[in-house]
Amino acid sequence: MGAFKITNRFCPVHPLHKLISKRGGVWVRKRSIFYNALLLTGVNLLLRGVSMVFQVYLSRRIGAAGVGLLQLVLTVETAAITFGLSGTRVAAMYLCAEEYGRRRLDGVRSALAHCLCFGAVCSVLTGAALLFGSEWIADTWLHEPLASGCLRITALALPLRCCAAILSAYFTACGQVRRLVRVDVIERLSCLALTMFLLLAFAGDSPTETCSAVLLGSIFTEAAACAALGVMICRDLRGHSPRAGLHMGQRMAKLCLPLAASDYLRSGLRTIEQFLIPWGLMRAGGSYEAAMAEYGMFGGMVFPVLMFPAAFLYALSDLLVPELARSRAEGNRMRVQHLTQKCLRMGLLFAGAVAGGLFALAPWLGQAIYGLDTPGRLLRILSPMVLSLYMDAIVDGMLKGLGEQVSCVRYNTITMAMDVLLLRALLPRFGLAAYLLSFAVTHLVNFALSLRRLLAVTGHTPDIRYAVRALLCTAGAAAAAFSVFGPGLWPILLGRTALFAVSFAGLLRLTGTLERSDTVWLRQALRGH
């Protein structure tokens, strides 16, 4: 499970969205989408923080090479979940949001039933394929025959994971974020506690035993969470039979086919990319252990830190899908343009703050978290990429909410194919530098294509001068933070953080980048109006 409704003063909304529940807790007064995003963000940051501590523990227990093997196993699991869902989670979110926006709970139930049935078929078939192919994948791709047991665990639990993902889409679509958050928090914390128990009680120091403990801990707790979500949905939709005449199967197919094609291509190419990295690093002159250590350093240690603050944007991206779907169903073009403007502007400020902060703090963060210099150096190199990575998360959510799944298929195909070709050609010759170059180029191209399509669909004209001012504020605040020096790790880290935050806020106000209307809107959004 996982990821702004603007104030009425700025953009009126249909009175339907202000209904208060009188039965089953279904019709609820909707808070701002930004407020819901902040709620999800706070929870996700807490859970990501706990997970990062757990990741540090794993890296010290099994080493960077062991973390690399664990990342490859989880890559296979992610690919299996993608094929098992086949676009049904986003389709469920989109269709439930449309039916909820028209106040048709029988339509919501019909949408959920169709998506669950289709997801069950896809996940069972995918799980069976993974179950029977586990030994071949472990030998050929993972180069670790003992990892086949981990893959079999993943295969058996796949239908359950996909069911939980589809059920969670209902709560996001209907604006019931708090209920989803409660279940998510309990499930994630229970998962970490159970995993730690399994690690300490039964698992040794081998990566395969560690991976099995991680998978089993998540499976048991996700089963309980799935049951809890199912019970809540049954209570909400009690007395509402699936409605006929809505052509729900056709509508679902129209969404799932392009979504599944996009996800298949993206996941397939991403999986190939992930397996190409250790292969290319070995061809560049390193041993298998050294290649897995470099891969684990980037994928399991640096990238989680780089994307840690993105919890807000992924939550916002998830919430934008149903919000824009409702606005599009109502024909409210003005609200779509307003959301586009606010999301792009606030997203750029947030991404700029994170990029500048990471650039100024990277070496000390690497030492503070992992006690190593290499993660900090890689983090500083990648920090400018935060701008395109974070903004792409917002743009992707808006495109899905506007029904632009086919465009997402096209852009993902182009950029992922570029990624694989660049890695295949450059990685054996230039090693990790080639991977960093490929990562930067393909993500920039994807963001540029997606943004171009979003602007064409919404009719929004971006303010280039605003973007330039925001980037200059980021650079100025980062430069100011470099003036802090000291003898110890934590004094420098805390001093640079404080000076960067003060400088960034001051420059935003001084240059007029953060306008009074923005602060008023943020204040009202924080209150949830």
State the predicted function of each range.
Residues 2-50, 106-110, 244-266, 518-529:
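N-terminal membrane topogenesis motif
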Residues 119, 123-268:
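Hydrophobic transmembrane helix module of multi-pass membrane transport proteins
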Residues 47, 55, 86-93, 153-172, ...:
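Short runs within selected transmembrane alpha-helices of multi-pass transporters and secretion channels
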Residues 32-93, 127, 131, 157, ...:
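Signature of the first transmembrane helix
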